[in-house]
Amino acid sequence: MAIVKCKPTSPGRRHVIKVVNKELYKGKPYSLLLSKKSKTGGRNNNGRITTRHIGGGHKRIYRIIDFKRNKDNITASIERFEYDPNRSSNIALILYKDGKRNYILAPKNLKVGDTVISGENVPIKIGNSLPIKNIPVGSFIHNVEMRPGKGGQIARSAGSYVQLVACDKEYATLRLRSGEMRKTESNCRATIGEVGNSEHMLKVLGKAGASRWIGIRPTVRGTAMNPVDHPHGGGEGRNFGKHPVTPWGLQTKGKKTRKNKRTEKFILRHRHK
């Protein structure tokens, strides 16, 4: 893994910082673990924009990732590491002893040829997946389930991890990188170690066109719009003089947006406190 700063041969190259990983496989992905992925442009089934600043970008093929890791007590070896355009982390192609292949999130410090295994009482080793109740307190884990058998949902992006703070027969307490403290069932599975490609956060696109390549459209300020488009729009010169709001007139700057009361009981400390 190397961080490369491009030479300023043009305005578009001047600020570019790349992350180069020579360990990544340069061929085509494993065809049996691919599926079609169509673009939405941020629109729903009615054609209305539900998520702004999305559209365009290079075509992508979805890699089917095994987030459940439920093929128990069968050793698998790391065949290769691959780039995945659908996520910030890299992925690893693993080959089980029975001949089946799967994609998993590539953990940090794992190498080609290393072995991983999942199960109830497997060794505490990077890349192994097991129930949280069997993991030592204080361990760093990733790909953590929120419900048993649903598949990992927490700590899946590049460089992310969760620390296991406490555990009893029913629930485990996790400390997320955001500062949030959360409970989850101790039967939920997690993978030992951190997610790899932690240098992803150091990458600088360097120009507007690079954002368009990955499907990100421009973010326009409300004050630069007309009154018909945004509550902040209009006025002679740079007038504002109001409380900041969203394009739909709802209060912003600190207003709580979380509405899922059903899972509120699992959050012991919010990330904003």
From Swiss-Prot:
Record-linked HAMAP family: Ribosomal_uL2_B
PROSITE patterns membership: RIBOSOMAL_L2
Region annotation (Disordered) ranges: 224-263
Disulphide-bonded residues: none
Organism of this sequence: Buchnera aphidicola subsp. Schizaphis graminum (strain Sg)
Gene3D superfamilies named among the record's database cross-references: 2.30.30.30, Nucleic acid-binding proteins, Ribosomal protein L2, domain 3
Family: Belongs to the universal ribosomal protein uL2 family.
One example of a Gene Ontology biological process annotation: cytoplasmic translation
Name listed for the protein in its UniProt record: Large ribosomal subunit protein uL2
Transmembrane intervals: none
